[in-house]
C-alpha cells in the first residue's frame, strides 16, 4: 500500500484499508453492515423477516472459529457449551439487527445487551424482559426462538453465568476503544467489489435503480494489514474475507453471472490470517466468477497446519504454483515429485590394459528426477520454477520489476522520491473523496462522519431574531 498507493490513486482508484497493525490508519469496518436484507418470493422487502438469517449464523461461526484462545476454549470436549454460546450470540445479534437503527447495529450494542443479562432478586434479567416484549410482538421471530432455546439449555444459574462469561470473553476485544471506534461504523464500501468501473455504466445504473442501497463503481483497491507479531485481531481479517467472498457471489449474480470488473485477491503471508470457513469451496467456486486468488506461503507445512484434511484440495484448485526458493524438506520433496522424471541417455565406456586390451562404449536409457532435492534447495536467488496445470514446469528468472512501465510511479526509498509515498492516514483526514476526518483524543485516532451544512434560501422572517456582532 505504501509503495503502490500513489500509483493506484493517480489511476483513479479508491483505496480502502483494514489496518489491524496501526488502527489509526484504518478505514472503519462494521461486519453487521453486510448482513443482507431479506426479500419475499416476489422480490419485495420482507417486513416479517427483514434480514437474511443465515448471514448472521455465518458471521458468528467465523467469529467462534477464530477466537479459540486458552481462556475461552472448552476443555471438557463437550460441544454443549459451544453450541449454547452460539445460540445465545445468535439471539443477541438478531435482536440488535431488528430493534436498533443502522448507527447502533454494531458489536458495542451486542456487548451492552450482554451486560443486561445479570438477573435481579426475582431471577429475571433486563435482557429477559426485552426478549419477552419482543416475543409478544413477533413470537415466530428466529431471535425469540433462539433465546428461548438458550434459556432452556442454560436453566441452572451457574450454567447460564458460565455461558455468558465465555461469550463476553470471546467478544472482549470490542471493548477496546480502538477496536470499538473502528467497528462501530462502516466506510469500507465492500459492495463495490467487481462492479463496473464507470459510474455511467448502463449496468451499474440498472443495478442501482433496482437496489435500496446505491452501489459505487468497482474501481477500488482494498488492503488488509495484519500485525506480524500478534494475531489477536486477525479474526477481523477472516471475517472481512468471509464477507468479501459472499459479496462477490452476490455481485456476480447482479452482473449476470460473472463480475463486471475482474477481481484479483493477493493473500500474502496467508498463514497469518485466521480460519476462513469453507475456503477450499470458495477457492474452487469463485474462480468461475472472474476472480483470481493468489495465496502466499513460506512452506507446505503452513498449509497443512491450517487445513489438515483438505490441504491437497487447496493445491488442486490452483492452476499455477510458483516456487521462488526454500529449504523446507517437505516442500522440496513435494516439488521434486511434482516435477517428475525425465528420460536421460547414459554413456559409459571401459578399457582394459592387458596384452590383449579391449575397450567398450555403452549407451543406456535411465530415468532421473527433473530436479533433485539438492538442486532445488540450491536454486540461485532471483530464479524460480513455475508449474502450470496441463503444461508442465518452467525454470526461469524472476521478472525485474524495474522494467515495468509503471515502476516510476512506485515509492522507492533509495530513489529519494518521498512525494510518491502513500499515507492513508492523511487520506482519511484530507482526501478529496473522504467525507470524514480524523480526530485525536488522548493520542487515540478515530474516524467520525462530517455533517455537511444545509444551504437554503432565507427570508426576512428568518432574520428577525438574528443578532450580528463584530469587532
Name every feature range the model reports, one short phrase each:
Residues 283-385:
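Conserved ATP-driven motor cores of ASCE-family P-loop NTPases powering translocation/secretion/packaging/pilus
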Residues 1-291, 306, 374-395, 410-471:
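P-loop NTPase motor domains
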Residues 22-25, 228-230, 299-302, 327-331, ...:
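Conserved nucleotide-binding/hydrolysis micro-motifs of P-loop NTPases
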